[in-house]
Structures are given as structure tokens and as C-alpha cells.
A protein has these predicted regions:
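Alpha-helical structural segments
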Residues: 30-38, 42, 73-89, 100-104, ...
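Amphipathic alpha-helical packing segments from all-alpha helical-bundle domains
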Residues: 100, 120-154, 160-164, 174-188
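Hydrophobic alpha-helical connector segments
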Residues: 87-129, 155
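Helix-turn-helix
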Residues: 31, 35, 39-72
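A structured, mid-to-C-terminal "fold-capping" secondary-structure block
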Residues: 164, 171-216
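Phosphate/oxyanion-binding loops and surfaces in catalytic or ligand/nucleic-acid-binding neighborhoods
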Residues: 85, 158-165, 169
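Short, residue-level hotspots on alpha-helical faces of the histone-fold
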Residues: 77, 81, 104, 153-157, ...
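N-terminal intrinsically disordered/low-complexity leader segments
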Residues: 1-26, 188-194
Length: 216
């Protein structure tokens, strides 16, 4: 007998997705996901609960357990809907296609900043998450001599960490005296080329370029 979470994942994947006998459900998994995403976009992942999703859909808290039995199951639905299908990945060569992939995935994280709060515990479970990995694997030719799955997971991690940094930046300028204090205590750091690192997009681009250069 499958758990509720397993049944939801099977439904997302189209595995054993035959319609259950009995009355037709009023809501679809997409409706549950959309309601939960709306709450998370407004108040963060911590604001999401089964009770709040039920309230948004005008159903009782008891009724929502017919669709999802836990927040973990709900998050599976949310992630799959939020990342969505990967767009067409284009570029003049495979490295440029990897950069395009990173940029497009980063856009999804900006649309739904709460995604960076979901810490991976292994390979993903949702079909759309696998779709993004597959898109990058297909963007790299076989003769590139690259472990494409590892590359996809590495770049996904860079995007995730950068999204958290971007969300956490306060925009406040550092104290005016801090530069001199750093130079006095850490002269090697002061002598190194130094530039503003407050632009997460630029930092992500630098990190991705460093990874791709290392694969040449």
C-alpha cells in the first residue's frame, strides 16, 4: 500500500495514475500547489501550512488531507509546479548553453525565493526537477568529456546558494571605517584585487565561469 506522499509523486510522474473510484475530487494537485505557492510567495515557506492552503481554497482542514497528508507532500507539489518545465536551452557552444541554463534557473528562484529554503537530502523526486537536470545533460555533447550529472548538480547548488545570498542582502553600505580596519589587520587581503561583491548575479556568473574554465 502506497503512502499519500508516494501516491502524489506517482501522480506527478504519471505512474499508476488511474482515477480512483468514488466521487470526483473537487480540486486537482495543481490547484493545491498554486494555493500553497501563492502563500509562500507572499510570506515565505514558513507561512505555508495545510490549514492555510485549505482556507485559501475554501475547504476544511480535514478535507485537504484527502489530497496531501503532510507539509513534505505539499512541498513536493510546490517544487514541481514552481520550477516548471525547463525552457529551450540555446547557445553557440555547450558552455554557453550551461550559462543559459544557470540564468534561467536563477530566474525561477527569483520568482519563488522560498525555493532556496528547501534543502536537498539527495536526488530530487519531482519530474520537473529532473527535467531541468535532463536539459543540461542534453546541452553538453558526449565528446565534451564531462560528467554531466555532477555538473548539473554543482550548478544547481551554485544557483541555490546564490539565491539565498541575493535574498539575504540588506542593501546597507558597510561602515566607512571598515576598509581601513581590514587593511590594517589583513594586509594580504588588502593588497589583493578587490571589488564590490554585493551583486549576487555577478558573483554567480563568476562562479559558473570558474567551474566551466576548470572543465576545459
Amino acid at each position: 500500500m502506497h503512502s499519500q506522499r508516494d501516491r502524489v509523486l506517482r501522480l506527478l510522474w504519471g505512474v499508476d495514475a488511474a482515477t480512483n473510484r468514488g466521487p470526483k475530487a473537487r480540486w486537482k494537485p495543481q490547484d493545491i500547489a498554486a494555493a500553497a505557492i501563492g502563500i509562500a510567495d507572499e510570506g515565505g515557506l514558513e507561512a505555508v501550512s495545510l490549514a492555510k492552503v485549505a482556507e485559501r481554497l475554501d475547504m476544511t482542514t480535514t478535507a485537504i488531507y484527502r489530497y496531501v497528508d503532510s507539509k513534505a507532500t505539499l512541498i513536493d507539489l510546490m517544487v514541481d509546479a514552481a520550477v516548471g518545465d525547463p525552457p529551450e536551452i540555446t547557445g553557440r557552444d555547450w558552455r554557453q548553453r550551461c550559462r543559459t541554463w544557470v540564468r534561467l534557473l536563477a530566474d525561477r528562484y527569483r520568482e519563488h525565493p522560498w525555493l532556496c529554503d528547501i534543502r536537498p537530502t539527495g536526488m530530487p523526486r519531482q519530474p520537473h526537477a529532473y527535467g531541468w537536470i535532463d536539459a543540461l545533460v542534453r546541452a553538453v555533447p558526449d565528446d565534451a568529456d564531462v560528467h554531466t550529472l555532477r555538473l548539473a548538480l554543482l550548478l544547481d547548488g551554485l544557483v541555490r546558494n546564490n539565491a539565498g545570498l541575493e535574498r539575504g542582502l540588506s542593501g546597507e553600505a558597510p561602515e566607512p571605517w571598515l576598509g581601513e580596519a581590514v587593511a590594517a589587520r589583513f594586509p594580504a587581503l588588502a593588497a589583493a584585487p578587490f571589488q564590490d561583491v554585493s551583486d549576487p548575479s555577478a558573483e554567480l556568473e563568476y562562479a559558473v565561469d570558474a567551474v566551466l574554465r576548470g572543465l576545459s
